[in-house]
């Protein structure tokens, strides 16, 4: 009775939600990126570091507990960055590469100084060629910090040091400039920082999951917007960003990972985007106001860079608004507490799958009074069905009288006609918040559960969990009394377990696990509720 009607209601709500989410997510579709660009937590020993990282003459290599980086001395920018504690996939021990400059894909940083005559940052004539004391920098086990200084002496009398500062156990790093003017004339310049990424024939999120809630694109935070997405499609169509702000950051995002640049803004900065059609790239960057450096004057410019997973608590420590990039949609106020609860359980269980099972029991237990009210109301409505049909037939030509008589019947029998669906409507935000939370949390990426489930964030490779979920839905349907008389509706309802099974084949394993446990709880709760209803004579 209850479940048959609920199947249709849930299907409608769920499909509507998915369509709305697809429209709101602003995700931009790109094809086929090597999955090395989709990024979990396992230590990779130094012996697994590819020796190729030492081979190129104009690159220096930086190795910390979390990073393997390549910095090009020509320009002094990070052009490749791999995360040592996150794997490219579950089949190898290779660290995930975030920043890259391969033949088919470019995702890199660029920063430096320009004059008022430099109109195009992407076609600079004068690019500094830095020198470094070493080709290899390693953050030792007994050190908390590592500094990588690069030096440049320009022909125009400009000298500066570009210093990368890494901190142990941190995905954020400092990029600090110390500039000195040894020229006899005052110099005027602007500081800029930029993120660039290829957009053609790439697949960072596509095909990884059947997951509409995935966003790949640019974003920024400014005086007027704490967090604003800026889609790659807008940039590639030359709908460029031009924002003046006194604080904030720029970033490029994918499902679980982010590269964000936070300049220390003393006055005003311009945030901008740029389409680079020649290289099939887009960029987002920041640029300072024009400033001057007198003869023998020295100026320091600081910025912070985050390269890594969307770890909300850690990102909030770097910038108050950076944690907003962990996007749990419009139900964030429910999803975030649920994630904190999941993390709390994981601390003691050390298995994300079991943690999901426990939180499912907890959530369904808390909602049990609502579930019982829903089943009770629907059972009462079923008892009233003969009288409702009688009223409908008696006053078929007088809808106003029909409605009045039915409301009188409900009042007399103390039945709320909305009592069956209202508890379900109240529960839906919690279920949808769990969807957001389970599909958007990097903690579940490559998280092992049991046996063949090595990644709770991706689909079940053998589709066993979706099939089990379909079986549980079939069992719920079979043990539930039915009041559906319409043969068409009855046929549709009978196919719902199969439809949902197919629908869930590509869902993240963690989410399917949640629905399996939730369905098992439903079976248990149905037995308890129906037993109580039979005792009081409501259910026959």
Curated annotation (Swiss-Prot):
Protein name: Membrane protein insertase YidC
Keyword field: Cell membrane, Chaperone, Membrane, Protein transport, Transmembrane, Transmembrane helix, Transport
Record organism: Wigglesworthia glossinidia brevipalpis
Compartments (UniProt record): Cell membrane
Family annotation (Pfam families): 60KD_IMP, YidC_periplas
Membrane topology value: Multi-pass membrane protein
Segments crossing the lipid bilayer: 1-21, 351-371, 418-438, 464-484, 497-517
Gene Ontology biological process: protein insertion into membrane; protein transport
InterPro entries xref list: Membr_insert_YidC (IPR019998), Membr_insert_YidC_N (IPR028053), YidC/ALB3/OXA1/COX18 (IPR001708), YidC/Oxa/ALB_C (IPR028055), YidC_ALB_C (IPR047196), YidC_periplasmic_sf (IPR038221)
Description of how the protein assembles with itself and partners: Interacts with the Sec translocase complex via SecD. Specifically interacts with transmembrane segments of nascent integral membrane proteins during membrane integration.
Gene3D superfamilies named in the record: 2.70.98.90
């Amino acid at each position: 009775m209850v479940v048959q009607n609920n199947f249709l209601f849930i299907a409608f709500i769920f499909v509507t939600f998915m369509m709305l989410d697809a429209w709101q997510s602003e995700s931009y579709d790109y094809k086929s990126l090597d999955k090395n660009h989709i990024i979990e937590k396992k230590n990779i020993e130094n012996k697994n570091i590819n020796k190729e990282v030492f081979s190129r003459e104009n690159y220096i290599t930086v190795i910390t507990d979390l990073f393997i980086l390549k910095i090009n001395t020509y320009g002094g920018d990070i052009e490749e960055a791999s995360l040592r504690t996150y794997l490219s996939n579950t089949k190898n021990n290779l660290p995930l590469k975030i920043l890259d400059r391969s033949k088919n894909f470019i995702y890199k940083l660029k920063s430096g100084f320009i004059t008022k005559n430099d109109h195009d940052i992407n076609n600079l004539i004068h690019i500094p060629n830095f020198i470094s004391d070493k080709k290899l920098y390693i953050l030792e086990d007994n050190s908390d910090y590592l500094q990588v200084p690069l030096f440049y002496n320009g022909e125009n009398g400009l000298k500066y040091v570009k210093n990368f500062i890494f901190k142990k156990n941190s995905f954020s790093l400092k990029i600090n400039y110390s500039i000195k003017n040894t020229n006899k004339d005052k110099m005027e310049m602007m500081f800029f920082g930029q993120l660039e990424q290829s957009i053609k024939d790439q697949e960072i999120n596509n095909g990884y999951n059947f997951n509409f809630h995935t966003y790949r694109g640019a974003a920024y935070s400014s005086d007027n917007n704490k967090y604003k997405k800026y889609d790659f499609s807008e940039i590639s169509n030359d709908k460029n960003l031009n924002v003046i702000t006194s604080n904030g950051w720029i970033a490029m995002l994918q499902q679980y990972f982010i590269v964000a640049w936070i300049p220390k803004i003393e006055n005003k900065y311009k945030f901008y985007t740029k389409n680079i059609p020649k290289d099939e790239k887009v960029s987002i960057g920041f640029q300072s106001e024009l400033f001057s450096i007198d003869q023998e004057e020295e100026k320091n410019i600081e910025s912070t860079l985050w390269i890594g997973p969307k770890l909300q608590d850690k990102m909030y420590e770097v910038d108050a608004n950076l944690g907003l990039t962990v996007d749990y949609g419009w139900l964030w106020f429910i999803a975030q507490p649920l994630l904190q609860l999941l993390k709390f359980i994981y601390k003691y269980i050390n298995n994300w799958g079991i943690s999901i099972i426990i939180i499912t029991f907890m959530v369904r237990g808390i909602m049990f009074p609502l579930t019982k009210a829903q089943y009770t109301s629907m059972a009462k409505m079923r008892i009233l069905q003969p009288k409702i049909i009688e009223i409908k037939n008696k006053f078929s030509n007088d809808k106003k009288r029909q409605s009045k008589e039915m409301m009188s019947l409900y009042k007399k029998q103390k039945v709320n006609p909305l009592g069956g669906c209202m508890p379900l409507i109240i529960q839906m935000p919690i279920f949808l918040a769990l969807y957001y939370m389970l599909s958007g949390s990097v903690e579940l990426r490559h998280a092992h559960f049991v046996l063949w489930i090595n990644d709770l964030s991706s689909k079940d490779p053998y589709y066993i969990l979706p099939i089990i979920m379909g079986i549980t839905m079939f069992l719920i349907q079979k043990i539930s009394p039915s009041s559906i008389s319409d043969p068409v509706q009855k046929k549709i309802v009978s196919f719902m377990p199969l439809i949902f099974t197919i629908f869930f084949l590509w869902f993240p394993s963690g989410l399917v696990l949640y629905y399996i446990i939730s369905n098992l709880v439903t079976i248990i709760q149905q037995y308890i509720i129906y037993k109580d209803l039979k005792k009081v004579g409501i259910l026959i």
